[in-house]
């Protein structure tokens, strides 16, 4: 079991009546290509109790029931550990959630989104805990899924960027990607994310820098927020005894200018929520200037500016975007020790394109079969309810 020990970054414990026992909540899943939809589910689950434990499945279990994961289990364990609402991570959690698992970790109940998770033979993985009344449901985040993100990478369009309409080509692909012929269901597929100020408020800490804290500024795309970003931010966080890390996120068009192709894969609003969910980040500047200006440094009272080992592309006028912090002597290059980049993730996906598309079609076929079985069961008279899936 991996325990998170970053104090307020993990969410302060809520004081309650002294006699009240802490409510322990269980979540589990693959958490492959972690995005703000996963983070939002964990945020909602954490709000239902006092202590959140998250079980993460192994590569072997995922391959058996769903298909090949994009990230290794070690990468996925660390990604979940970095989400600020998570108190503990349980590696190698069983794919089917049982009462034995809940009891082993002293959890009162488990929480899952209002979608369906099925085993390789088409059974509900939460069947046992549902029947025992130890299952709670939270609202699934609309507009984001691993299926959608994979589709964006494979189609290579810019339709998902924040200032552009969805093209007819992307809409057609979004409607069909990973779909099994002859039907579709509400759980697998693509929909558009609608950003609201309330969602940002829910993810933000709302905490201002305090006296004695070191304000550290980092900037970039933080696209497909991944373990490489986490390792970098963890190193940055460890540079000060009391760090306050501000992440500046560039506009989509700015990212596309220096990255090219159809980058960023996630638009600015989506990237904002992904970064806000990280326990090492205190604040996000939405649409930060590419060059770190004197105005920005003075406004946020920045003590230190950090950049990783990736190449620094000159600004449009040919200047060094870190010229001002270097002039002030507050620039620091940080080696995260992790070479993973968004480009490498996209390469993993493209290399295994057929496997991922087949995985999504297989997943939806199971979900449709389950839906139909449930529909038939509900249509039968009570005395005949004995449906064998």
From Swiss-Prot:
Metabolic or biological pathway, per its Swiss-Prot or TrEMBL entry: Phospholipid metabolism; phosphatidylethanolamine biosynthesis; phosphatidylethanolamine from ethanolamine: step 2/3
Provenance organism = Bos taurus
Which EC numbers characterise this protein's activity in its record? Answer: 2.7.7.14
Q: Which PANTHER family match?
A: ETHANOLAMINE-PHOSPHATE CYTIDYLYLTRANSFERASE
Instruction: State the CDD domains in the record.
Output: CCT, ECT
Its recorded reaction(s) are: phosphoethanolamine + CTP + H(+) = CDP-ethanolamine + diphosphate
Q: Which GO biological process categories is it annotated with?
A: phosphatidylethanolamine biosynthetic process
Q: What is the protein's given name?
A: Ethanolamine-phosphate cytidylyltransferase
Give the modified residues of type Phosphothreonine.
Answer: 341-342
> What keywords appear on the UniProt entry?
Lipid biosynthesis, Lipid metabolism, Nucleotidyltransferase, Phospholipid biosynthesis, Phospholipid metabolism, Phosphoprotein, Transferase
Q: What class of enzyme is it?
A: transferase
Q: A Pfam family for this UniProt protein?
A: CTP_transf_like
Give a Gene Ontology cellular component term annotated to this protein.
Answer: cytoplasm
Q: What does this protein do?
A: Ethanolamine-phosphate cytidylyltransferase that catalyzes the second step in the synthesis of phosphatidylethanolamine (PE) from ethanolamine via the CDP-ethanolamine pathway. Phosphatidylethanolamine is a dominant inner-leaflet phospholipid in cell membranes, where it plays a role in membrane function by structurally stabilizing membrane-anchored proteins, and participates in important cellular processes such as cell division, cell fusion, blood coagulation, and apoptosis.
Annotated binding of CTP, by residue: 221-222, 229-232, 259, 307-310, 336-340
Q: Which family does it belong to?
A: Belongs to the cytidylyltransferase family.
List GO molecular-function terms, semicolon-separated.
ethanolamine-phosphate cytidylyltransferase activity
Q: Which InterPro entries match?
A: CCT (IPR041723), Cyt_trans-like (IPR004821), Ect1/PCYT2 (IPR044608), Rossmann-like_a/b/a_fold (IPR014729)
List the SUPFAM superfamilies hit by this protein, alphabetically: Nucleotidylyl transferase (SSF52374)
